[in-house]
């Protein structure tokens, strides 16, 4: 996990890129794609959860990274509970999978003692945002659309994260 975090970290924003050119260490688009950042959050929480308790130093490092990133991410949450496709670019469209994933991470983080209960209201606002994007037939709209993830639409990944969000057990 540390290797991924170190390679994808964007110093200017404190967020993470989703593509890195290993040949020269550059980031082709340099964007903090919100779903990618949400994957980092859910990965940190889940990895912390499954590491043996005897790995104290590693668990503490994951916890610190998780809490720090969650703090940065929540600054980008919009008033309606959602997030932009590029997390730190308000000119991009509002994306639906991101709040589902971050809500999962908050619910799991609170359950596991990594986050305080005061964050539940923000997670609940994310969940409410996501629910407003669900059509009567169950499809979730305005996710980064499969397979290119370059415009709003639907994706099976988003559908799965919405189910996990509703279970409130973490991703």
Question: Where do the model's predicted regions map?
Answer:
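A structural signal for long alpha-helical coiled-coils and helix-turn connectors
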Residues: 5, 48-52, 74, 110, ...
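CBM-like carbohydrate-recognition segments
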Residues: 83-84, 89-171
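Oxyanion-binding "anion nests"
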Residues: 39-87
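Acidic/His metal-coordination segments adjacent to aromatic residues that form catalytic metal sites
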Residues: 18-30, 81-89, 147-148
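A short glycine-/small-residue-rich loop at the edge of a beta-strand within enzyme catalytic domains
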Residues: 31, 35, 57-64, 89-97, ...
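Long, well-ordered core segments of solenoidal/helical folds
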Residues: 1-17, 63-81, 122-139
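Loop-centered beta-sheet repeat module
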Residues: 1-45
């Amino acid at each position: 996990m540390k290797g991924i975090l170190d390679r994808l970290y964007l110093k200017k924003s404190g967020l993470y890129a989703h593509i890195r050119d290993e040949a020269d260490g550059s980031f082709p688009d340099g964007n903090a794609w919100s779903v990618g950042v949400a994957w980092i959050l859910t990965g940190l929480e889940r990895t912390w959860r499954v590491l043996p308790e005897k790995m104290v130093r590693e668990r503490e490092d994951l916890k610190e990274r998780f809490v720090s990133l969650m703090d940065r991410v929540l600054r980008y949450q919009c008033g309606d509970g959602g997030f932009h496709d590029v997390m730190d670019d308000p000119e991009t469209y509002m994306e639906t999978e991101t709040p589902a994933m971050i809500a999962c991470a908050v619910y799991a983080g609170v359950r596991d003692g990594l986050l305080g209960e005061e964050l539940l209201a923000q997670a609940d606002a994310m969940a409410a945002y996501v629910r407003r994007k669900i059509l009567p037939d169950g499809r979730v709209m305005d996710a980064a659309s499969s397979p290119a993830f370059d415009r709003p639409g639907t994706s099976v990944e988003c559908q799965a994260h919405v189910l996990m969000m509703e279970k409130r057990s973490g991703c």
